[in-house]
């Protein structure tokens, strides 16, 4: 039969045939065919208009679309561009559809109402059926009769049946198409019936399937094969000019294959939690809310008349706990995870043979007291930064020494010297981690995946060099213990400027960088800068926040990188690709422009296996932060965070431009509520926007016009006004002001380094921030010892969003205070900062409305500043069990069956919620339970003290000293865990623990001697008391210490409290019968 060189394949069950191209000329498209622009919907070549130009459907974004797909979208779809959403306008040669303007100025009556070509209709319909599941084929089926000239014999069981005419054929190819690669399946019908046609997948090249009678078995493999073949053709394509000379076309510039190239694909993606895990969790939250409603309905309507005070107190505490749970729960509604593609980042910004286009990064390291923050730990952090897997010319490390200690200065000089050996060793053998202390101390097979024979020898030599380096640092620490009476002097005999910590000038020293110092292999090293800001009496230095703002200004003058990484001195880089992970979000062309910072989770070394004080804080970092990432992003936690410099400067997030003429979003269309008011409203909004532009935009655009030399009216006046406003905002440094306008960062290449150093000294002077917006709207925000929460909150109020990045290998690791006292002091400082924010004008309950802060994100910030106030009801609630056992009263009446079921459902909902959180958060039950225990321990100790200290500081002006958490050196595994340090924070939990234990003894004794009418109340009171004791068990274990011996001070407190409880015991007198006769009067005759 005459098939035109094509293969006919059939299916007996489906009663249809498929026509497949099988000739050699159609196997691979030629380079000339691929060079034309193709439709992104059906992959057909876009036709040319009458004037010879390609057909353009969307005038806003020029998304490649052929005319048939354009006409189908206007008639059957949303009438909008798939890429930008702009409503399609009628183009000459296309029919009019509902919604077109009557006065479109197109004189095209012959095409205004004509029908579409059926073959294109079926292709567009099939594509949109795949995108919009649920549409029936009847919406896109079109009728046309067969042509008598297209006679193809019917192939029946491999035999040609010439007795059947063309109007009875199952396969009909219309002669009007002229396209050999178009196939239409038609069910068997008679000559008088209309025929429904449908093509094969339009974008598929059918020749990739080869010969045979079977269609594809694995679509994915065929699709991959097709993409590889097309990409190979494009790579080998040569485009000739008029003289015949050709040049290789860069495949990255081919508009027909934007997503085929790996380097043009997104650098990251969101991974929502599986619905099988998150949907039951969401349903349970609603169930728990319903159970809470029933619970409070029962509690309020069933008071305890003989213990009304206990009942009322317990109900108030329970209501507060419910509100606190709601504030903590709903920000977890939409948790997500993220995945980065480092290979795509390299393909896009690190092309072979060209300089790296990755953005520069300035890294900030802050330290205060070298006695509490050992210099060896700080040196390891700096070494891990200098050896990071990032272009060396793009990295600058700034170390802020807020204590102006010569010990830190000398330790950095030794660190810079050792870095010349350590950095090339790390990059040569790709070792992890790149902090030498933790690399050499890790217990693992260091030869795994190492193939270089020289590795063992060089590792031994490097370990010996590092041990010598440690000896030098330890010698410095030993010498610094005895401070001379006249203070320290430098090598040239001049006094060290920082001998007086509270009164000294600013100091800047560049150890590495552009000074010509290279590593042992002759390669350039990243810049290393020592900074100690000026301090004078009478100036408020704002502690860590002020030091970080000084680093922002110094780095803006010296390097001005567009991105900043902030780490504490004890948080080293555990993953050398951590900065690249952050750049996958920051430098993403589509989603990166609105990201203000990328927050990494905190991971810790040196914590005991049981983590009795919940130092890892896994519940917060693996559950709460994932939930926030699905809303507007995680909060800033103070370290391990990559910032966008422009966001720290207080600028608003870029607004997404709404394309004009967008289609109405009302659904369904017959229920449109706009009523023609949409355009008017949009016009009013635009007028308001023109009347009230952003002040920062005015300033930036004014200075941009000046730099470009544009001659506009009153240019000089505008430039002076803008300059004055920027100086009022950023300070009197012209270099700093000019650097704020450079979105991509950088400093002029012809600037004298000496002049930059002089400018740097100026911007770290103690009076530079006066009458500026530093600490108010720019940089780290002042007003709280937890400046991290306040700084991230201000950015979110400006419309920015943040991102939570959790790479498989932890990006940063630090040391945590495993000692009980140090841990409680750390929690005290965090809670104190939250109280200060709550009592300030920046409280998220009333600040930031009308900005870009989302409601669920606001809930999370409210919870972060309200949680210290929970300590009051928590302390009272934990005291109630002992009071109930000592007095014989209870907070609930006699429990009925309904009440018993209600209480059981309440406890079950709490337990199941925790189990489901552990499931989608991927944490263990040990971590979850330790977090619950320390919530009680910290709530009745650190949070309580923070609440009173915050009230005294804000209301009475009584200042509290900021205590730096000590970072212990490696003197032995868990050596700090069992050291007992007395602090007043231990008093409240100790008291609660003892009175509840005594209460249990009293209750059991009372029950044994006098008996109970009902054992239910006794079990309820015992369960209540044991609940408190179990939660305080880690605290009790910490008090006992390593030797299981009670310290003397605790013994004294126990005796004092026991005396008080003994008096209560005598007052209660449980051995005396309350209802029966008095034994002293009755005597022994009563026993007869």
Curated annotation (Swiss-Prot):
One GO biological process term: cellulose biosynthetic process
Entry GO MF terms: cellulose synthase (UDP-forming) activity; zinc ion binding
Enzyme class: transferase
Residues that hold Zn(2+) 1 according to the record: 39, 42, 66, 69
Positions where N-acetylmethionine occurs in the chain: 1
Cofactor remark from the record: Binds 2 Zn(2+) ions per subunit.
Protein's recorded name: Probable cellulose synthase A catalytic subunit 9 [UDP-forming]
Tissue: Expressed in young plants, stems and flowers.
Residues at the active site: 402, 788
The protein's Enzyme Commission number: 2.4.1.12
Chief site of localization: membrane
Glycosylation sites: 961
Amino acids binding Zn(2+) 2: 58, 61, 81, 84
Cofactor(s) needed: Mn(2+); Zn(2+)
Transferase found in the keyword field: yes
This protein's pathway: Glycan metabolism; plant cellulose biosynthesis
Coiled coil, from the record: none
Residue spans crossing the bilayer: 284-304, 307-327, 872-892, 898-918, 934-954, 984-1004, 1016-1036, 1046-1066
Binding site for Mn(2+): 544, 568
Record family assignment: Belongs to the glycosyltransferase 2 family. Plant cellulose synthase subfamily.
Organism: Arabidopsis thaliana (Mouse-ear cress)
Protein's membrane topology: Multi-pass membrane protein
ZnF region ranges: RING-type: 39-85
Subcellular location: Cell membrane
Key word Transferase present: yes
Stated role: Probable catalytic subunit of cellulose synthase terminal complexes ('rosettes'), required for beta-1,4-glucan microfibril crystallization, a major mechanism of the cell wall formation.
Ranges per topology, Extracellular: 305-306, 893-897, 955-983, 1037-1045
């Amino acid at each position: 039969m005459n098939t035109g060189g094509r293969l006919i394949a059939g299916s007996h069950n489906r009663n249809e045939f498929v026509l497949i191209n099988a000739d050699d000329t159609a196997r691979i498209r030629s380079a000339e065919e691929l060079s034309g622009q193709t439709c992104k919907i059906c992959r057909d070549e876009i036709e040319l208009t009458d004037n010879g130009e390609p057909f353009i459907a969307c005038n806003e974004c020029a998304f490649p679309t052929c005319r048939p797909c354009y006409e189908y979208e206007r008639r059957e779809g949303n009438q909008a561009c798939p890429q930008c959403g702009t409503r399609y306008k009628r183009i000459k040669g296309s029919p009019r559809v509902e919604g077109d303007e009557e006065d479109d100025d197109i004189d095209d009556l012959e095409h205004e109402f004509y029908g579409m070509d059926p073959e294109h209709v079926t292709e567009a319909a099939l594509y949109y059926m795949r995108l919009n599941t649920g549409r029936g084929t009847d919406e896109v089926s079109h009728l046309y009769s067969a042509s008598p000239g297209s006679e193809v014999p019917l192939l029946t069981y491999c035999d040609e049946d010439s007795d059947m005419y063309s109007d009875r054929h199952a396969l009909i190819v219309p002669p009007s198409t002229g396209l050999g690669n178009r196939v239409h399946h038609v069910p068997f019908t008679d000559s008088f019936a209309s025929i429904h046609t449908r093509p094969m997948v339009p974008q598929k090249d059918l020749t990739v399937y080869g010969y045979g009678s079977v269609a594809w078995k694995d679509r994915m493999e065929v699709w991959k094969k097709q993409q590889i073949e097309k990409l190979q053709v494009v790579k080998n394509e040569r485009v000739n000019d008029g003289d015949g000379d050709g040049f290789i076309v860069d495949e990255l510039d081919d508009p027909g294959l934007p997503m085929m190239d790996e380097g043009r694909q997104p650098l990251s993606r969101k991974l929502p939690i599986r619905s099988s895990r998150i949907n039951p969790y969401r349903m349970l939250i609603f169930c728990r809310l319903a159970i809470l409603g029933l619970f409070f309905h029962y509690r309020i309507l069933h008071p305890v008349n003989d213990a009304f005070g206990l009942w009322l107190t317990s109900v108030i505490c329970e209501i507060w706990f419910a509100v606190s749970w709601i504030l903590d729960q709903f920000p977890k509604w939409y948790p997500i995870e993220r995945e980065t593609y480092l290979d795509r980042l390299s393909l896009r910004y690190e092309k072979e043979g060209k300089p790296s286009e990755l953005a520069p990064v300035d890294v900030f390291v802050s330290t205060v007291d070298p006695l509490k923050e050992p210099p060896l730990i700080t040196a390891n952090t700096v070494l891990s930064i200098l050896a990071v897997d990032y272009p060396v010319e793009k990295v600058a490390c700034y170390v802020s020494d807020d204590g102006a200690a010569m010990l830190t200065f000398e330790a950095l000089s030794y660190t810079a010297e050792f870095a010349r050996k350590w950095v090339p060793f790390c990059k040569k053998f790709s070792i992890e981690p790149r902090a030498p202390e933790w690399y050499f101390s890790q217990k693992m097979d260091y030869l795994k995946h190492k193939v270089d024979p020289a590795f063992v020898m060089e590792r031994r030599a490097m370990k010996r060099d590092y041990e010598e380096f440690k000896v030098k640092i330890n010698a410095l620490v030993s010498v610094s213990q005895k401070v001379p009476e006249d203070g320290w002097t430098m090598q040239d005999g001049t006094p060290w400027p920082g001998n007086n910590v509270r009164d000294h000038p600013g100091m800047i020293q560049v150890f590495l960088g552009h000074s010509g110092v290279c590593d042992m292999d002759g390669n350039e090293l990243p810049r290393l800068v020592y900074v100690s800001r000026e301090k004078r009496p009478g100036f408020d230095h704002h502690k860590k926040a002020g030091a970080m703002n000084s680093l922002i200004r110094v780095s803006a003058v010296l390097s001005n990188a567009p991105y900043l990484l902030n780490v504490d001195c004890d948080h080293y880089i555990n993953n050398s690709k951590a900065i690249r992970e952050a750049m996958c979000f920051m430098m993403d062309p589509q989603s990166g422009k609105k990201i203000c910072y990328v927050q990494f989770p905190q991971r810790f070394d040196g914590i005991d296996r049981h983590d009795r004080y919940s130092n890892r804080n896994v519940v917060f970092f693996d559950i709460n932060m994932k939930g926030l990432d699905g809303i507007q992003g995680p909060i800033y936690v103070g370290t391990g965070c990559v910032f966008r410099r422009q966001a720290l400067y207080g600028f608003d997030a870029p607004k997404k431009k709404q394309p004009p003429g967008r289609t109405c979003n009302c659904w369904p269309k017959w229920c449109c509520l706009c009523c023609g008011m949409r355009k008017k409203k949009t016009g009013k909004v635009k007028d308001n926007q023109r009347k009230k532009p952003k002040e920062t935009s005015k300033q930036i655009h004014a200075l941009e016009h000046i730099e470009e030399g544009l001659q506009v009216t009153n240019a000089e006046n505008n430039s002076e006004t803008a300059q004055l406003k920027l100086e009022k905002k950023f300070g009197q440094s012209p270099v700093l002001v000019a650097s704020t306008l450079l979105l991509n960062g950088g400093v002029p290449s012809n600037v004298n380094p000496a002049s930059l150093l002089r400018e740097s000294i100026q911007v770290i002077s103690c009076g530079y921030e006066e009458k500026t917006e530093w600490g108010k709207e720019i940089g780290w925000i002042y007003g709280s010892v937890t400046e991290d929460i306040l700084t991230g909150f201000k950015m979110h109020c400006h419309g920015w969003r943040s991102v939570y990045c959790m790479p498989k290998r932890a990006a940063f690791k630090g040391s945590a205070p495993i000692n009980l006292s140090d841990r409680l002091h750390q929690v005290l400082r965090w809670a104190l900062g939250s109280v200060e924010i709550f009592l300030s004008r920046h409280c998220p309950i009333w600040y930031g409305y009308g900005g870009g802060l989302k409601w669920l994100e606001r809930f999370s910030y409210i919870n972060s500043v309200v949680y210290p106030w929970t300590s009051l009801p928590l302390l009272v609630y934990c005291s109630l069990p002992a009071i109930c056992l000592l007095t014989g009263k209870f907070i609930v009446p006699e429990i009925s069956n309904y009440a018993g079921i209600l209480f059981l459902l309440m406890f079950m909902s709490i337990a199941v919620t925790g189990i489901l959180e552990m499931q989608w958060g991927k944490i263990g039950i040990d971590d979850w339970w330790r977090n619950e225990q320390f919530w009680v321990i910290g709530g009745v100790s650190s949070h309580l003290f923070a609440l009173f200290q915050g009230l005294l500081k804000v209301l009475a002006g009584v200042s509290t000293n900021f205590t730096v958490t000590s970072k212990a050196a490696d003197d032995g595994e868990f050596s700090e865990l069992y050291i007992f340090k007395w602090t007043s924070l231990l008093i409240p939990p100790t008291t609660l623990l003892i009175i509840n234990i005594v209460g249990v003894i009293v209750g059991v004794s009372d029950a044994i001697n006098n008996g109970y009418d009902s054992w239910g109340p006794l079990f309820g009171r015992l369960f209540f008391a044991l609940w408190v004791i179990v939660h305080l068990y880690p605290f009790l274990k910490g008090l006992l210490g390593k030797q299981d011996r009670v310290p003397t001070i605790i013994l004294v407190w126990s005796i004092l409290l026991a005396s008080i409880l003994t008096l209560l015991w005598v007052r209660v007198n449980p051995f005396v019968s309350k209802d029966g006769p008095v034994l002293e009067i009755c005597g022994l005759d009563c026993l007869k």
